[in-house]
């Protein structure tokens, strides 16, 4: 489902021939260099940030169950980290090299996992919004519903559904060879009606409907909080509002980050996507926005969650403490016990 930066055949799938004389516009130059620098920054920030989130959430007391929200955040971070490690370095070669050199398997895998990661992210965010809805609107029943077992089952279902939905991308992604010894990795569907149907279904079920579900859940949450504001303790009110705010910001950022990607796909399938400097810039921006979504969530947690900030600091303190053989045992025990995040207590 990912549009290649050098050709549009992946976008419309109608013709495996590249645009005539694309090098003056799409050749390696200042634009591609800047894009590679942006990719490098996204990769470095995302790998560091998501690794930190995973470390924080993995450091729980033995035998203590993790909260459902934290399990979903952990799943989101794992999906983002895997995407950054497996996709961005390979996709960057498209901007750096004039031809595809990584073979058929990598051609299929990176575009397939790109779509899998996108779907896992939006489905996880939808699950988190439902989790917030149950925790706040149906708080009396939430203790029996919001358990680790149900969250893990949900995570398993999310991955299975995403893997299945993305499978056509892997099937139709293939290599095309030109007489000039150039190779391109393109998505090509023999039946264009099937391609159009798949693009629409991916947009509807992998973007639009999950966002509508998220909007519904948060509308209910905000309405409930407004009605029950007087009956809540200030501490409980602040905790629930902060958790809902954090998840909501993550959702809004996801929606903004992935909207240009879907616009380009729908435009390429049902319109005449132009090959102009402006459209090339739009495509580059869509790529960078989609990729950056995998690196911004840890920053959001740091800005909106005081407990996440404390946990981040404790990860580094723990490393310093482990390197000091004469550290105080009591202080080390305190550091080794991670604080809960705002998402833990609801």
Swiss-Prot record:
The cellular location(s) given in this protein's UniProt record come to:
Cell membrane
Q: Where is the lipid attached (S-palmitoyl cysteine)?
A: 318
**Expression (tissue specificity):** Spinal cord, small intestine, Rin14B insulinoma cells and several brain regions, particularly ventral hippocampus, amygdala, supraoptic nucleus, hypothalamus, thalamus, lateral parabrachial nucleus and locus coeruleus.
Q: Which residues form a coiled coil?
A: none
Endpoints of the signal sequence: none
Q: Which GO terms describe its biological process?
A: adenylate cyclase-activating G protein-coupled receptor signaling pathway; G protein-coupled receptor signaling pathway; neuropeptide signaling pathway; positive regulation of cortisol secretion; positive regulation of cytosolic calcium ion concentration; positive regulation of transcription by RNA polymerase II
Described by its record, this protein's role is as follows: Receptor for the hormone galanin. The activity of this receptor is mediated by G proteins that inhibit adenylate cyclase activity.
Record protein name field: Galanin receptor type 1
């Amino acid at each position: 489902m990912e549009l290649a930066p050098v050709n549009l055949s992946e976008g419309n799938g109608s013709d495996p021939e590249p645009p005539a004389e694309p090098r003056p516009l799409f050749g390696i130059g200042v634009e591609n260099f800047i894009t590679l620098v942006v990719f490098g920054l996204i990769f470095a920030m995302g790998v560091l940030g998501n690794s930190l989130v995973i470390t924080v959430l993995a450091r729980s007391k033995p035998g203590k169950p993790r909260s459902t929200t934290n399990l979903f955040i952990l799943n989101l971070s794992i999906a983002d980290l895997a995407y950054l490690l497996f996709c961005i370095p390979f996709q960057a070669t498209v901007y750096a090299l004039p031809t595809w050199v990584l073979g058929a398997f990598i051609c299929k895998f990176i575009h397939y996992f790109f779509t899998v990661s996108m779907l896992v992210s939006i489905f996880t965010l939808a699950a988190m919004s439902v989790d917030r809805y149950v925790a706040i609107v149906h708080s009396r029943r939430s203790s029996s519903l919001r358990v680790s077992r149900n969250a893990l089952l949900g995570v398993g279902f999310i991955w299975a559904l995403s893997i299945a939905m993305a499978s056509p991308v892997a099937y139709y992604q293939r290599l095309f060879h030109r007489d000039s010894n150039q190779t391109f990795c393109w998505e090509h569907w023999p039946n264009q009606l099937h391609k159009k149907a798949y693009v629409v279904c991916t947009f509807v079920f992998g973007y639009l409907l999950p966002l509508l579900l998220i909007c519904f859940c948060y509308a209910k949450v905000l309405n409930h909080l407004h009605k029950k504001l007087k009956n809540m303790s200030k501490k409980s009110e602040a905790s629930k509002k902060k958790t809902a705010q954090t998840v909501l910001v993550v959702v809004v950022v996801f929606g903004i980050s992935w909207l240009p990607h879907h616009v380009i796909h729908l435009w390429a399938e049902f319109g005449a996507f132009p090959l102009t400097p402006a459209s090339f810039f739009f495509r580059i921006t869509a790529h960078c926005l989609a990729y950056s979504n995998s690196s911004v969530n840890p920053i959001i947690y740091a800005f909106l969650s005081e407990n996440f900030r404390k946990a981040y600091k404790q990860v580094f303190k723990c490393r310093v403490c482990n390197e000091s053989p004469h550290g105080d045992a009591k202080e080390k025990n305190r550091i080794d016990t991670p604080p809960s995040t705002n998402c833990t207590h609801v």
